[in-house]
Amino acid sequence: MMSVLKKICGSKNSLKSFDNEVYQSIEKELQRQKSQLQLIASENFASKAVMEAQGSFLTNKYAEGYPGKRYYCGCEHVDKIESLAIERLCKLFGVKFANVQPHSGSQANQAVFASLLTPGDTILGLSLSCGGHLTHGAAPSLSGKWFKSIQYTVNKDTYLLNMDEIEKLALEHKPKLIIAGASAYPRKMDFKRFREIADKVGAYLLADIAHYAGLIAAGEYPSPAEYAHVMTSTTHKTLRGPRGGIVMTNDEALHKKIQSAVFPGLQGGPLMHVIAAKAVAFKEALAPEFKTYSKKVVENAKVLAQELQKHGLDIITGGTDSHIVLVDLRSQKLTGKDVVDSLERAGITCNKNSVPFDTAKPTITSGLRFGTAAETTRGLEAENFKEIAGLINEVIQGLISGNSSSVEKAVKAKVERICSNFPIY
C-alpha cells in the first residue's frame, strides 16, 4: 500500500518535484551565499555534517522532558543524542552542567530570568545603543518590561566598558542580576571584575557569550566559566553550528532551576534534529582545527580593522579583540543604511549598526558592523581581508563622490572573483 507521503509528494518525494517554488528560493539563496561576501557578525557557514543532522528524520520525533525522563516513548535514540550534546558542550567550555534545549539565545536568556528573577526585580545590562542586546533590558524587549532595567554604557572617549561606572550603578541600584555580554562590542570583557561587582551587591552574574562562544571555546577570548553564575549562548555565530541556544553553569542548584525554566517553563518539546546538529557542531569545535580557525577569525578581524583605518575610516575602540569590527560613519557624513544598501548591491553583506551615543534612528544608524567568522570558514586569509577593506572603502568613496552605481558594478565583479576562488559546499 502506498504511504500518505508518497501520495502527497510523489514517488520521488523530493522538494524540487513537489514544491519547486520553495526549492528555487533555496537554490537562489545558496547562489547568493556562494557569490557574495558574508560579513554579518552573527552569521557563519555550518558544515554539511551539521546540516545533515538538522535535516534528518529526527524532525519527526517528539521528546518532551530530558534524557531518561521523557513524557513520550520511543526516545532511546534521541536520549543518546541529547546526552552526547550535553557531554560535549560541558567539555568544550569546562563546565559541569548544561541545557541544550533552548530554541534560541533569547530563550536561553529568558530561561535564566525565569530561574533567578521575579517581575519587578532590578537587572543591570549594557545599553542597546552601546552594543548590548535586546534581551539585556532594552525597553522593547520583555526583559525591559518585566524587570526594572538599569543600563550601563561605555566610556564616551574610548568607547570601552567603564567598569568603575558599572560598579557605581550596581552599588546604587542593587540589581539582582548583572549581565555581561554584547551584540556589538569588539573588545575583551573583564569577567573577573564583573563577578567582583556582582558579589559586592549580592547579584547573580549572567555571561551572555553568544557572539564570542566559539572564540572562548578555542581559547581566543577570555572565558567567564570561572566567574559567571550562569552562561548563555547561541550555537551559530562563532560556534558555527545550527541556529539555537544553550545554558551552562557550574552550580547544580541553579542548573535544576534552569532545567525547570526551559521545560516546562518556556518550551514544550525540544527540537531533536537541532540538538543533533548542536552535538555535531560541538564535536567539530573540540577538534584542534577549530582552534586554528578561531585564531584566524580574530587575526582577520584585526587586519580588516587596521586596513579600514588606513583608508581613513573611524573604528570604534580603535580595533578589535574578537570577530567584530565596528565602523563609525559620522565623520564621513553617511548613514549606516545608505552604506549597507550600497555594499549589498556590490555583493558585500553586513549590517547597519548604532554606534555609542548614536543620535540616528535604529533603522538608519551611524555605523556598520562587520564580522569575519563566515568568510574565515570559507578560507579567506589576511591578504584577502586587506583587499576586502579596500573594496568597502571604494563603495564608501563612491557614495561620497556620487558615483556609486559604476563603483558598485566594478566592486561586485571583484567580489565574485574572490568568491569563485573560495567555493562553499
Curated annotation (Swiss-Prot):
PROSITE patterns found in the cross-reference section? SHMT
- Main localization, broad class: cytoplasm
InterPro entries with a match to the protein in the record: PyrdxlP-dep_Trfase, PyrdxlP-dep_Trfase_major, PyrdxlP-dep_Trfase_small, Ser_HO-MeTrfase, Ser_HO-MeTrfase-like, Ser_HO-MeTrfase_PLP_BS, SHMT-like_dom
Catalytic activity, reaction form: (6R)-5,10-methylene-5,6,7,8-tetrahydrofolate + glycine + H2O = (6S)-5,6,7,8-tetrahydrofolate + L-serine
- One GO-annotated biological process of the protein: tetrahydrofolate interconversion
The UniProt record lists the EC number as 2.1.2.1
Q: What domain of life does the UniProt record list for this protein's source?
A: Bacteria
**Site (Plays an important role in substrate specificity) location in chain:** 236
Binding-site residues for (6S)-5,6,7,8-tetrahydrofolate, renumbered to this chain: 128, 132-134
Tell me which residues bear N6-(pyridoxal phosphate)lysine: 237
Per UniProt, what is one GO molecular function of this protein?
A: pyridoxal phosphate binding
Ordered alphabetically, the record's keywords are:
Amino-acid biosynthesis, Cytoplasm, One-carbon metabolism, Pyridoxal phosphate, Transferase
NCBIfam families under this entry?
A: PRK00011.1
What do we know about how this protein assembles, alone or with others?
Homodimer.
Family of this protein: Belongs to the SHMT family.
Task: Tell me, in a sentence or two, what this protein's role is.
Answer: Catalyzes the reversible interconversion of serine and glycine with tetrahydrofolate (THF) serving as the one-carbon carrier. This reaction serves as the major source of one-carbon groups required for the biosynthesis of purines, thymidylate, methionine, and other important biomolecules. Also exhibits THF-independent aldolase activity toward beta-hydroxyamino acids, producing glycine and aldehydes, via a retro-aldol mechanism.
Stated name of the protein = Serine hydroxymethyltransferase
Species whose genome carries this gene: Wolbachia pipientis wMel
Which gene name belongs to this protein? Answer: glyA
